Amino acid sequence: MTKRSKVFVPAVVTVATVGVAAGAAYVARYRKDDVKELFVAQALERPAARQSYTELAQGLERAGIALFQRAGRADDTQANRAVLTHIIGLERWGQERLRVALGEREFVRDEHHPYKPGAGVSLRELQDLLSQTRARTVDLARRLNASPPAEGTTVEHNGLGPLTPKGWLRYLTQHADLESRKLRGAKEAKALGE
């Protein structure tokens, strides 16, 4: 390889990398709705549509086991309490959206913040609330199975747009799973230098 080609290859790689990054930035800025729709379709709606409400309820239960284990190992820190508070609040908010799909309430465009447990709730209380909240979500999935909404029913998600009830169940499962990975035990926090 000549000296010229040794310089040329990294330059081409750098230009290509910058081009990909610029393209990603363009898509993120100007095509974010397209990206969001693709995410909703590929990560939420398509996998959820292949499952029955019974299977989604079972998935919520299975994911709940891992969720409760992570919460059980969590050290009593403000950061961990904040994560659990967020998970509980968002799941309760999602439950209200599922009740809209069941015809039990009218749609209200609100945020998840009012559904969060109040300040000063202990870690142990949050762990119990998490278990109760997930049990209610599983119950809603079973009720959806017993009385499925009409085909094509959607309920608005403030950030993701309209979701089917099955999409909502998958979203709640995935959200809690991803957020709970932020929980840290005492040993993990020390290893990470916190």
Locate the predicted segments by residue:
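Short, flexible active-site recognition loops that position polar ligands and cofactors
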Residues: 162-173
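A hydrophobic membrane-anchoring alpha-helix module
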Residues: 172-190
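Acidic/histidine-rich alpha-helical segments that form the ligand environment
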Residues: 53-70, 114-155, 170-172
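Hydrophobic alpha-helical topogenic segments used for membrane insertion/localization
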Residues: 4-28
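Short, helix-capping/interhelical loops that line the mouth of catalytic, cofactor-
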Residues: 23-54, 93-134, 150-151, 191-194
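Helix-loop segments that flank and shape redox-cofactor active sites
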Residues: 61-82, 103-110, 145-164, 192
